[in-house]
Amino acid sequence: MSAWLGTATLALGRVTLRPFTVDDAEALSEVVGDPERFRWVPGVPTDVSSSRTWIEAALADPSRRIAYAVVDNTDGRLVGTTSYYDIDPGNLTAAIGYTFYTESVQGTAINPTAKYLLMRHAFEDCGAVRLVWHTHESNAQSRAAIAKLGATFEGLLRKHRRFGEGWRTTALYAMTDDDWPGARDRLLARIGR
């Protein structure tokens, strides 16, 4: 476990983030639906076996990644996932990503609430100074969602990650602890808190 960020369960209103377990494989297998919706996200699990493998990989090195199941508290369903990764306690930084949701909750308050919980925990409880987001440069939906959180676009990282048979150019976004108070207030207004 990351001693710095820990693995606390985080909750607000309709959303609970709790650490994944392998027992979540069946529920996770129902999240993706049409894999074409996730063409920019390599390796999304589409059945119970690939979900189990995905969860095992997500849990393999908890000092570098903390994977959360996103639960919709209105019905208790697992509706997606999000993670801290590239955790660097020495520099008080981490990335937020490995995020995907079932189609029925996309465009709702689920994602902004989940991201608010991760950012609040990192900045306010753990003293983070910088959080970053990475996405494929052509993933317009993800880029718009990250920008709406209040993160600043910092540039493109060429040949940053493998992507299929080639390489991905990554759009890099970041938020610092100096940015957080304003972003927090806008996010709380957005999610109705």
Model-derived regions, located:
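GNAT-family acyltransferases
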Residues: 1-110, 121, 125, 160-193
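Conserved GNAT acetyl-CoA-binding A-motif
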Residues: 124-134
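Conserved beta-strand-loop-alpha-helix junction that forms the acyl-donor binding cleft
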Residues: 133-143
